[in-house]
Amino acid sequence: MIDFTEEQIQRYSRHILLQDVGVEGQEKIMNARVLVVGAGGLGAPVSLYLAAAGIGTIGIVDADVVDLSNLQRQVIHFTKDVGVPKVKSAEEKIKAINPDVKVDTYYEVLDSANALDIIKEYDFIVDGTDNFPVKFLINDACVMAGKPFSHGGILRFNGQTFTHLPGTACYRCMFKEPPPVGAVPTCSQAGVLGAIAGMLGTIQAAETLKYFTGIGELLTNRLLTFDAKTMQFRTVPVKHRDSCAICGSNPTIDHLIDYEQAACDLHK
């Protein structure tokens, strides 16, 4: 059991006051280990809110440096950070918000060679990318390792997210394989409203905190979508497919795959 300091009691007082969280829930948060893949549009708000909440360890995977075009939506990075590795920039902001948080940085591409080794160290994974090959890689690695994760994706004015727990519908239950190269425009080609990243990222952060505290109902077997133009939110039921190639009763995928695909630079 954590022996809370007076500073921690004050820092997390608004959580502790919640009947559904309390001291016990905050302790679970502070003992949690979360991996955020991508320190970009989605990874930025996720990391900031999880750090503020007191997540014990946050791992960040990103192989890119901050670009001026990132600053329109990637709020964890500042103008002074242009040219700096995103993991370094993100770590600096996380520690500034909450020095209690331990930060693990991975300045590398997540791929089939390292995904399982990295993911196994964490309790919950957040997909903060907008890159189809990596999304399928995260899904497959988490299913293989029995890890829960939050999927998120945004483009133009739209966003979508769902949460996977072992035994529930996975990304491949919805989308069997990545689309053909060039079939879906990237964010650098189609654009994205900056605030959309914050809208979806904070939902992913909330799902992460709900997972550790056991609050409410997670977005399992449901895909939440929204259109910021109309501010309409929809929840679409998603069934776990027994024939799914990775999580079905007779999986046909027994190793991780590095798909080739034009990548959206939202996470870059």
Spans of model-derived segments:
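Adenine nucleotide-associated cytosolic modules
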Residues: 1-268
